[in-house]
Design a protein with these regions (language model features):
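Helix-loop boundary and gating motifs at the non-cytosolic
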Residues: 4-61
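Hydrophobic core of transmembrane alpha-helices in multi-pass small-molecule transporters
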Residues: 23, 91, 103-122
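Intracellular juxtamembrane helix-capping segments at the cytosolic ends
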Residues: 36, 120-134
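Loop-to-transmembrane helix entry/capping segments in MFS-fold secondary transporters
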Residues: 47-48, 134-146
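Glycine-rich segments within core transmembrane alpha-helices of 12-TM secondary carriers
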Residues: 60-64, 140-166
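Transmembrane alpha-helix termini and helix-breaking/packing motifs in multi-pass membrane transporters
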Residues: 69-74, 96-97, 156-184
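C-terminal ends and interior cores of transmembrane alpha-helices
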Residues: 82-104
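Symmetry-related core transmembrane helices of the 12-TM Major Facilitator Superfamily/SLC fold
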Residues: 86-90, 184-196
Length: 196
């Protein structure tokens, strides 16, 4: 290992980037796999449509091995980590706007499909950064942090933010919003939070 690589590995503590990297890895997967079903159910979509489309948009995580070998041909792993995080945030913002559209379901599914490709690409790049930036010993040392923050993303998304959508729904309903409008408003706020 050359001196430059060794210095870059020692310059920034893994505790400063491993937790956020794996939290960001877990969030799109959990939102598309679990939270989107609650969102669509609240907005009146049938169970059959929800099951079909949410399972279909999860395919990028299954087939990500197809484009994994080509990522470093174009740019670095770090580039793809940053780019996919920004792209996913922007797309969640678009989804927040899409729930207000007349054909919101089709548009939101389309946006979520792009989030899925972005999230799957982020998974590939994030694992690559983890392996290339950390020594074998450090990889073993921080594997617990990796898993903890990936699972924290699950807890925040499925527990905290789904609860928050329900809390907002109650508030919007209390001020006279119709049921559908109250759900649209509450999910707009939650999807906007996923932007950050």
């Amino acid at each position: 290992m050359n001196q430059l690589t060794q210095n870059s590995r020692q310059s920034l503590s893994p505790l400063r980037w491993v937790p956020s990297l794996y939290f960001a890895m877990g969030l799109p997967f959990v939102v598309l796999n679990m939270v989107s079903a609650v969102l669509f159910k609240d907005l009146g979509i049938s169970d059959a449509q929800i099951a079909f489309w949410t399972s279909l948009i999860m395919w990028p995580w299954t087939i990500k091995f197809l484009w994994s070998p080509f990522l470093e041909i174009f740019r670095t792993k770090k580039f793809f980590v940053v780019t996919t995080q920004l792209l996913s945030g922007i797309l969640f913002g678009l989804a927040a706007l899409a729930v207000h559209m007349p054909h919101f379901f089709a548009v939101t599914v389309g946006v979520f499909a792009v989030v899925a490709f972005s999230g799957a690409t982020h998974d590939i790049a994030a694992d690559g950064v983890y392996m290339s930036e950390l020594s074998t010993e450090d990889q073993a040392r921080y594997i617990g942090w990796q898993g903890a923050f990936y699972n924290l993303a699950k807890l925040v998304a499925t527990g905290g933010l789904v609860w928050f959508a329900g809390f907002l729904y109650e508030g919007f309903s209390a001020v006279g919003a119709a049921t559908f409008d109250a759900y649209v408003r509450s999910w707009t706020v939650v999807l906007a939070i996923f932007c950050g």
